[in-house]
C-alpha cells in the first residue's frame, strides 16, 4: 500500500552500491507507516543502453535530451561510464551504481534536490530464492524520501538473465516473493527479458511467474511498440518484431497513483547501429 513515510518504486540491485556522499543504512525492509496520497507526479525513465554496442558520448547526449524526469534507471552500463551518464543528467542528480554484472551493470539516478536517499541494496537472493548466481546482475533498489511531502518509496530496477531461462524464472519468482514481503508500494522497472509477443499476448516462463498470486501488476504501455532491435543474422531486419523485453510492474495498491507507461520512440532509433542502444526507453509516470 502507499504510505506517508513509505511507498515503493522497485528497481533491483542489492549487494552494496555506490552512493555519492551519502551514508546508506543497511535495512532489509522499509518501515510501515500511515497511508497518504501525494498528488505530485513522479516520472521515471528506464533504458537498457547496450553497454558493448554503443558510443558512450552518443548515449550521454541522448540522456541529456531527456528533460523532466525525476528518476533514471539504466541497464547495461559499463563502470567507466557511470560518471559520464550522471553528469549528462544534470548537477542535481545523484547516482547509485550496481557492483554486479561485469560490463552490464545497473545504475539508478535521482533528483537529489527533490529526494533524499535513505537506503540502497543489491539483492543476491531473497529468502531461499536466487536472484544472482554470481555471473549476472543483481536487482538494484533505492529507498527515497520526498523532501517536501515526507513520502518514502522504493525504486527497483532489473536486468534479468538472457541466456539462462531457468535462472530467469528463479529470478522472477524471487522478485515476486520479495514484492510479497514489502509493506509499502513497489514499482519494479527495467529489462526483464520476458519475451512478450504482441500477437500471442504471451511471454516466457518468467513472465508467468512474476504475475502469480497477483503480487505485481503490469503497467501496460498506452501503445504496444517493439522495445528491442535484434538483427542476429545481419539481414537488416529485426528477428523479433512486435515484442517487448522492457516492463514496468507495480503492486495492486500502486494503481491508485494512476500509473501511465509508454514506449519512447525517437527518429532513427531503429534500426540499431554501433553508436546507439538496441533498446527503446520506457517511461512511467505516477500521479
PLM regions and their residue ranges:
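N-terminal, active-site-proximal structural segment of metallo-dependent hydrolase catalytic domains
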Residues: 17-90, 99-106, 122, 173, ...
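Structural recognition of the beta-strand scaffold that forms the well-ordered cores
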Residues: 43-46, 70-75, 97, 106-110, ...
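Structured beta-strand-rich core segments of catalytic domains in phosphoester-bond hydrolases
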Residues: 77-152
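Solvent-exposed loop/turn segments at secondary-structure junctions
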Residues: 49-53, 77-81, 100-104, 113-116, ...
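Extracytoplasmic, non-cytosolic globular domains
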Residues: 59-62, 138-215, 219
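Metal-dependent phosphoester-hydrolase catalytic domains
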Residues: 24-29, 121, 180-187, 194-287
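Active-site-proximal beta-strand elements of phosphoester/diester hydrolases
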Residues: 41-51, 119-123, 141-143, 152-162
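Bacterial N-terminal signal peptides
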Residues: 6-15
Amino acid at each position: 500500500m502507499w504510505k506517508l513515510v513509505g511507498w515503493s518504486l522497485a528497481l533491483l540491485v542489492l549487494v552494496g552500491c555506490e552512493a555519492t556522499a551519502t551514508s546508506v543504512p543497511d535495512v532489509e525492509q522499509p518501515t510501515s507507516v500511515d497511508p497518504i496520497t501525494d498528488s505530485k507526479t513522479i516520472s521515471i525513465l528506464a533504458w537498457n543502453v547496450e553497454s558493448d554496442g554503443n558510443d558512450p558520448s552518443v548515449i550521454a547526449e541522448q540522456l541529456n535530451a531527456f528533460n523532466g524526469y525525476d528518476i533514471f534507471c539504466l541497464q547495461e552500463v559499463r563502470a567507466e561510464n557511470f560518471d559520464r551518464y550522471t553528469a549528462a543528467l544534470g548537477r542535481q542528480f545523484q547516482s547509485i551504481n550496481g557492483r554486479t554484472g561485469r560490463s552490464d551493470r545497473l545504475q539508478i539516478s535521482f533528483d537529489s534536490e527533490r529526494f533524499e536517499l535513505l537506503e540502497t541494496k543489491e539483492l543476491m537472493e531473497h529468502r531461499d530464492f536466487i536472484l544472482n548466481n554470481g555471473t549476472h546482475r543483481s536487482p538494484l533498489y533505492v529507498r527515497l524520501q520526498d523532501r517536501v511531502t515526507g513520502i518514502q518509496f522504493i525504486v527497483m530496477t532489473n536486468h534479468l538473465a538472457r541466456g539462462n531461462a531457468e535462472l530467469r524464472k528463479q529470478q522472477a519468482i524471487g522478485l515476486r516473493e520479495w514484492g510479497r514481503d514489502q509493506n509499502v508500494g513497489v514499482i519494479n522497472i527495467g529489462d526483464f527479458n520476458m519475451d512478450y509477443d504482441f500477437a500471442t499476448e504471451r511471454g516466457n516462463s518468467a513472465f508467468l511467474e512474476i504475475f502469480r498470486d497477483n503480487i505485481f501488476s503490469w503497467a501496460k504501455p498506452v501503445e504496444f511498440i517493439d522495445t528491442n532491435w535484434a538483427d542476429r543474422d545481419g539481414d537488416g531486419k529485426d528477428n523479433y518484431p512486435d515484442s517487448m523485453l522492457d516492463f514496468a510492474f507495480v503492486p495492486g495498491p500502486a494503481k491508485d497513483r494512476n500509473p501511465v507507461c509508454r514506449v519512447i520512440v525517437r527518429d532513427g532509433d531503429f534500426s540499431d547501429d554501433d553508436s546507439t542502444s538496441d533498446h527503446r526507453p520506457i517511461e512511467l509516470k505516477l500521479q
